[in-house]
Amino acid sequence: MSPLISAASVLAAGLAVGLASIGPGVGQGTAAGQALEGIARQPEAEGKIRGTLLLSFAFMESLTIYGLVVALALLFANPFVS
């Protein structure tokens, strides 16, 4: 294996995890803040807001997991190495 390909794969794996975590992290913070505001304004809708929030968290976390899968593929099942 070429050292250049190995180094580029490790760098790409780190970037995949890092960049895949930034968007969902910001989105989850924003969603949680808006959910708290909604519950404060309308306490009787707490159950529905919480259910929707947890479902949206699951979808946001799936993006991070996809980044992790790409990083693991680059590290352990590298398609650029023969």
Curated annotation (Swiss-Prot):
Transmembrane stretches, start-end: 3-23, 57-77
Any single Pfam family the record assigns to this protein: ATP-synt_C
Feature type site, description Reversibly protonated during proton transport: E61
Topological type in the membrane: Multi-pass membrane protein
GO cellular component: chloroplast thylakoid membrane; proton-transporting ATP synthase complex; proton-transporting two-sector ATPase complex, proton-transporting domain
Coarse class of the protein's main subcellular location: plastid
Compartments where located: Plastid, Chloroplast thylakoid membrane
Gene Ontology terms, MF aspect: lipid binding; proton-transporting ATP synthase activity, rotational mechanism
InterPro entries the UniProt entry points to: ATP_synth_csu_bac/chlpt, ATP_synth_F0_csu, ATP_synth_F0_csu_DDCD_BS, ATP_synth_F0_csu_sf, ATPase_proteolipid_c-like_dom, F/V-ATP_Csub_sf
Record key words, sorted: ATP synthesis, CF(0), Chloroplast, Hydrogen ion transport, Ion transport, Lipid-binding, Membrane, Plastid, Thylakoid, Transmembrane, Transmembrane helix, Transport
PANTHER family: ATP SYNTHASE LIPID-BINDING PROTEIN, MITOCHONDRIAL (PTHR10031), ATP SYNTHASE SUBUNIT C, CHLOROPLASTIC (PTHR10031:SF48)
HAMAP family membership: ATP_synth_c_bact
Function text: F(1)F(0) ATP synthase produces ATP from ADP in the presence of a proton or sodium gradient. F-type ATPases consist of two structural domains, F(1) containing the extramembraneous catalytic core and F(0) containing the membrane proton channel, linked together by a central stalk and a peripheral stalk. During catalysis, ATP synthesis in the catalytic domain of F(1) is coupled via a rotary mechanism of the central stalk subunits to proton translocation.
Miscellaneous comment text of the record: In plastids the F-type ATPase is also known as CF(1)CF(0).
Family: Belongs to the ATPase C chain family.
Subunit structure: F-type ATPases have 2 components, F(1) - the catalytic core - and F(0) - the membrane proton channel. F(1) has five subunits: alpha(3), beta(3), gamma(1), delta(1), epsilon(1). F(0) has four main subunits: a(1), b(1), b'(1) and c(10-14). The alpha and beta chains form an alternating ring which encloses part of the gamma chain. F(1) is attached to F(0) by a central stalk formed by the gamma and epsilon chains, while a peripheral stalk is formed by the delta, b and b' chains.
Name the record gives this protein: ATP synthase subunit c, chloroplastic
